[in-house]
UniProtKB/Swiss-Prot annotation:
Protein's organism: Homo sapiens
The name this protein goes by in its record: NADH dehydrogenase [ubiquinone] 1 alpha subcomplex subunit 11
Membrane topology: Multi-pass membrane protein
N-acetylalanine: modified positions: A2
One of the GO biological process terms: proton motive force-driven mitochondrial ATP synthesis
Length: 141
């Protein structure tokens, strides 16, 4: 399932169909947030059922918001700048997602650090896609 969702994102050219790109990044981030929430609730059990539901929602919706902001920012910056395959678009998207995380946590330090780290990570992923880097090589049979 994961390769299908990632393929859905990468098959859309940058700077086009921003709503579909935002949907893809939101769904990917939501699954990541739900996974983090499952670990959080399992390893640090809440006092009541409602506290657990609140924590799961908090993690999931925060991740979904970060994913949506990332997808929209990368697509809109590619469209506005008219440079669809530029890693700077992904840096801007990662930075915007990091700032969203900082706003959610009400912490400037987290927002600034997440802006830099998410931006660098996203631009490295884009550079890797453009240059054909293989992180996990396919086995040669």
């Amino acid at each position: 399932m994961a390769p299908k969702v990632f393929r859905q994102y990468w098959d859309i050219p940058d700077g086009t169909d921003c709503h579909r790109k935002a949907y893809s990044t939101t769904s990917i981030a939501s699954v990541a947030g739900l996974t983090a929430a499952a670990y959080r609730v399992t390893l640090n059990p809440p006092g009541t059922f409602l506290e657990g539901v609140a924590k799961v929602g908090q993690y999931t919706f925060t991740a979904a918001a970060v994913g949506a902001v990332f997808g929209l920012t990368t697509c809109i910056s590619a469209h506005v700048r008219e440079k669809p395959d530029d890693p700077l678009n992904y840096f801007l998207g990662g930075c915007a997602g990091g700032l969203t995380l900082g706003a959610r946590t009400h912490n400037y330090g987290i927002g600034a650090a997440a802006c830099v780290y998410f931006g660098i990570a996203a631009s490295l992923v884009k550079m890797g896609r453009l240059e054909g880097w293989e992180v996990f090589a396919k086995p040669k049979v």
